Amino acid sequence: MSVQLPAHVREEIDRWVAKFPPDRKRSSVISALHAAQHENDGFLTTDLMDAVAAYLGLAPIHVYEVATFYSMFETKPVGRHHVSVCTNISCMLRGSQEVVDHVERKLGIKTGESTPDGRIYLKREEECLAACTGAPMMMVDHVFHENLTPESIDKILDELT
């Protein structure tokens, strides 16, 4: 089955391609995959990866390698809202495991799972989200939430619809 990228996704990819030399379209593959994943409810299918490869003139294997290497890409259906808890050393020393435990209890799921209603996906361990000064922290739909407490976590999660 052949999938076509919607016009607005192709336009977004074109904006990224324009940032690189003409012979370096490959440099825009991460941004292209982000655009395709966002369009498809937060995950990539093989058909979507093939469409990105075709649009960029790349071998499909190159796109698959990128999509399966980086933790920011999902290759199976997941919840609408993506929650990532940083577990690197700075966050760990400031209570990230307690944050993970609290989120798992509150949502009734483990890392790598989505809530039964498909509302929230708790990503597997994130090695570093580059916000060490605000540890412990988590990212929800690409927005950083720092200096977390059980109360602030509950408020953040309760506001997700």
Q: What positions do the PLM features span?
A:
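Signature of N-terminal electron-transfer/Fe-S-associated modules in redox systems
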Residues: 1-161
